[in-house]
Amino acid sequence: MKRLKKEKDQCIVNNALQVISNNEQLEEGSCLYVLAYEERFDLRLFDELMHSISVVSTYNKPIGVQLLYQLYIIQRISLVLMASHFNPEDLYCIESEPEHWKEHLQELDDAIFACIKGQALKVITYGKEGA
């Protein structure tokens, strides 16, 4: 049973990493705009990507800064979308009216960076224990 869960978690990680590495647009979040415009936005994908942070650190695999940055971008935008009950026009508003979103995004940034910092510290700590 434990082995099946580990294999399932590893599959989630591999899928998440593959999605990120195969889609350079994720870095800038532009693919979210395309998905929203085509009404194909699927929050489950982003939930899996975010879950992969904890799974990767659980299995003592170092998380690259670039991966953390990409996951941060995804989480930031998905949280904005969830907070606004997701309207495709919100993506345009975020770009065209940054002052309107600035305070809200700052709160999200603080929470997300705390999460990322915590995960990075876990990875560093696990790495030292294994050495």
Name what the model sees in each region.
Residues 1-50:
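Short terminal alpha-helical segments
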Residues 20, 38, 53-57, 75, ...:
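Generic structural signal for hydrophobic core residues of well-folded globular domains
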Residues 25-29, 62, 121:
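Intrinsically disordered or highly flexible coil/loop and linker segments, enriched in small
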Residues 32-39, 60, 64, 94, ...:
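Alpha-helical rod/repeat scaffolding segments in eukaryotic adaptors/tethers
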Residues 44, 66-69, 103:
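Residues within HEAT/ARM-like alpha-solenoid scaffolds
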Residues 51-68:
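Short, solvent-exposed, charged loop/turn and helix-capping segments
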